[in-house]
Amino acid sequence: KLHVGETVRRAIPTDGIPFHPRWRKIERKRPQIMAICDVSGSVAAYAKFLLMFLYALQDVLPRTRSFAFSAALGEVSDLLATLPVEEAIERVNLKYGGATDYGRALQDFSELALAEVNSATTVIVLGDARNNQADPRLDLLGEIKSRARQLIWLNPESTRLWGTGDSEMLLVKKECHLAKECQNLKQLERVIDKILSDRR
């Protein structure tokens, strides 16, 4: 069985190409993944890391659907599946980069994909939850949580910054099954392995 966490961790330094697949003995059913990635200016320092994660995850877990946003959200699964990693990241940033509005993004996600979220779906949000004082639409986040197997929020900011300034993270984490700081490969691998091992 493919060890997805280790493979993704190893793939990111090689531009998302899983040259060194790792295998585990325990058979596990692969979950359906929907990943929502913030590519706004406030996460500019981490945007490539987050998009590399999407690129590698989609490569090793074919049932992954990927979405990107700053305000308006759109699906980027085809871009990540068909283009070289650097070109895919450039296209995503060009199309979806800008000022952040999580409420708008969650509304768009609800219209595009909420009907397909069910007890077999893990939804991952990658972003800093900084929302420019706009309405974060916690109601929509709660609706996603109620439908999904897991709702996981990965924040590239240190936990000591959560809730400071325009960060909505302290409110957001109450609507998630799991909320974690994620700014390096080791943290990322732990979360991915949890996604695969958790049988709620």
Predicted regions span which residues?
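Short acidic, S/G/P-rich loop/turn micro-motifs used as interaction or catalytic elements
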Residues: S42-A44, L73, R130-Q133, R160
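Von Willebrand factor
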Residues: V76, E87-T121, S158, T164
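Negatively charged sequence features
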Residues: K1-P31
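DG-centered beta-turn motif at the end of beta-strands
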Residues: V8, I36-S40, T121-Q133, H177
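Charged helix-capping and loop-helix junction motifs
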Residues: L51, P136-G142
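Von Willebrand factor type A / integrin I
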Residues: G142-R200
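Short beta-strand-loop
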Residues: A68-E90
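…and closely analogous acidic/polar surface helices at protein-protein or active-site interfaces
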Residues: P31, I36-A68, A72
